[in-house]
Amino acid sequence: MKKLALLLTVFLTAPLLALADNMGNDFRDHYVRGTSNLKAYNRDLNGLVGMVDFHTGRAKVFPGINLGANVSVFKPSSGNNISSDSYTVLPFLIAETKIPYLGVGVVARGTDVNGYRSLGGGLTYQMTLIEFLNLSFGAFYDNGRTDWYRNDHYSASAIASTTILMFTPYIGVGYDYGKIKTRGYDPNESASNGTPRGMVGLNVNPFPLLTGFVAYTVTKDSHGFTGGLGLNF
């Protein structure tokens, strides 16, 4: 299963990562204390990670598991004078299962690509409001780092979806809050802030074990795209 997840990640991310700069090196090359807008960089980083909150909108009941390979692509905001790429690219591996009887989903996610390492997770809850409308809620925490900074990311999200044949369109809202602190500088600098996030997406379930998904995300200052594949075991 791990090998399959790795193959999915490589397949989804290789073309994009080939065009992307190393996030750690890019920060080192463009960050200047007192001049660079660390708050704007932190806000964009929160949005980049927060887009992963709902990668498929569904989970299998334990011992079943949903394993996803996700790619986030986020455009740096106009105030971010640190990131040099037109878009920042970051893939994630995500594992999710649901606790029997409680209906609570448990999510683990992480990445170690493009100079950025992150490990996190959270809890989700799904309910049917009316016969054709499903609601999902989630709360997450992620701890990330490069060689030049560390960051903590907190998020909460809510999503509404409906299933028509093999298609599940959905719309969601969320809020990302994060703290960042540079490392290796004298003195180091820190920043913290948050921003709301809106999302619209589509899941496609062509086979019982396979789900594909794409979504568009907009924040107060920027926007991004996310997509990938999920496998149910």
Which ranges hold each PLM region?
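Outer-membrane beta-barrel transmembrane domain signature
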Residues: D21-S86, R145-T211, T217-K220, L231-F233
